């Protein structure tokens, strides 16, 4: 049954993770260049001092990935093609894990992700802050974001205030006249989610939860100090580049740009008159965002675009390939820089930027990013996830690993709905959870 059919606001919410037993979690990362299914075993552990919010050890017991088809710049363009790729990826993961998958946590890149901060306040009359007061102010803030054509993916309280004093993490039992909250809400077009759910359902699977791609990749690639002090995670995928900003242990901003590694490939194919497949190989083997002195002398063979035996490969300098690659990379990084500046969170990001995603592996990218962003830059890989094959330990698998981590941190979210409040933990079908239980777990 569709989770869009029963409630205007109802998106699937994950079941709570018991702190005393293990869980099997299945995730699906749908991207423009690849589709990844992972099956993991989550085992209770003491909370990590380095990795934020990790309450369980994650061990991957099954993984399957296929070259993506039917997705362009994060948007589903061919349901039949994508359905087939999903089936193959899930089947490979099931065979490796020795179990059957019924439902998955899925990432969301399309649908014009929007990130907004909503503020609400209520009068306390000098009384003590009670659980009911928290409920009222949280619902008031979250309800401001409700739109007929958009669905709430994430709603995270980023901070409270009492009588104008900001930066309060837990106001419960404190006294004041005015209680306020700042709520970060990530929304997405409902039609994009419907198409995503439809495609998963056609593969005879159900959607257990949905997570914004920038949130997932940040969860996998950032360490505790970065999440607390402020940092931007830039996920450079094949069709899109997403931005997530974390501070004080919370996701506080997301954004997306319709440029990625595949745009570099198409630039090479056009500029060098070669096939997409050959351009991709050129990018991986010879592509760089930095010129060096020998590039003008080094010659590279470019296969012709046709199949005529009389067509001979052309010879171009490595410098020409680098100039084509560098132009698109610089454009993307300049857009990222401008988006961070426009967001108003540039001071919070400070000097810390983490690059992740498959396109972040391009030679010379960190150095170019440091120059354009004027910040310290490192490449982020999935951390704290055991059992990954060597090929899946790189930045390209950060989103999939972040989806595996997400159930451990989902309890910080709240979702308002028709005068009540959604906990992120329901029965998987959008059932309204008890507010008291959420408040007990959160405070």
Curated annotation (Swiss-Prot):
<dbReference type="InterPro" id="IPR050696">
    <property type="entry name" value="FtsA/MreB"/>
</dbReference>
<dbReference type="Pfam" id="PF14450">
    <property type="entry name" value="FtsA"/>
</dbReference>
<dbReference type="GO" id="GO:0032153">
    <property type="term" value="C:cell division site"/>
</dbReference>
<keyword id="KW-0472">Membrane</keyword>
<comment type="similarity">
    <text>Belongs to the FtsA/MreB family.</text>
</comment>
<comment type="function">
    <text>Cell division protein that is involved in the assembly of the Z ring. May serve as a membrane anchor for the Z ring.</text>
</comment>
<dbReference type="InterPro" id="IPR003494">
    <property type="entry name" value="SHS2_FtsA"/>
</dbReference>
<dbReference type="InterPro" id="IPR020823">
    <property type="entry name" value="Cell_div_FtsA"/>
</dbReference>
<dbReference type="Pfam" id="PF02491">
    <property type="entry name" value="SHS2_FTSA"/>
</dbReference>
<keyword id="KW-0997">Cell inner membrane</keyword>
<dbReference type="InterPro" id="IPR043129">
    <property type="entry name" value="ATPase_NBD"/>
</dbReference>
<keyword id="KW-1003">Cell membrane</keyword>
<protein>
    <recommendedName>
        <fullName>Cell division protein FtsA</fullName>
    </recommendedName>
</protein>
<comment type="subunit">
    <text>Self-interacts. Interacts with FtsZ.</text>
</comment>
<dbReference type="GO" id="GO:0043093">
    <property type="term" value="P:FtsZ-dependent cytokinesis"/>
</dbReference>
<keyword id="KW-0131">Cell cycle</keyword>
<keyword id="KW-0132">Cell division</keyword>
<dbReference type="GO" id="GO:0009898">
    <property type="term" value="C:cytoplasmic side of plasma membrane"/>
</dbReference>
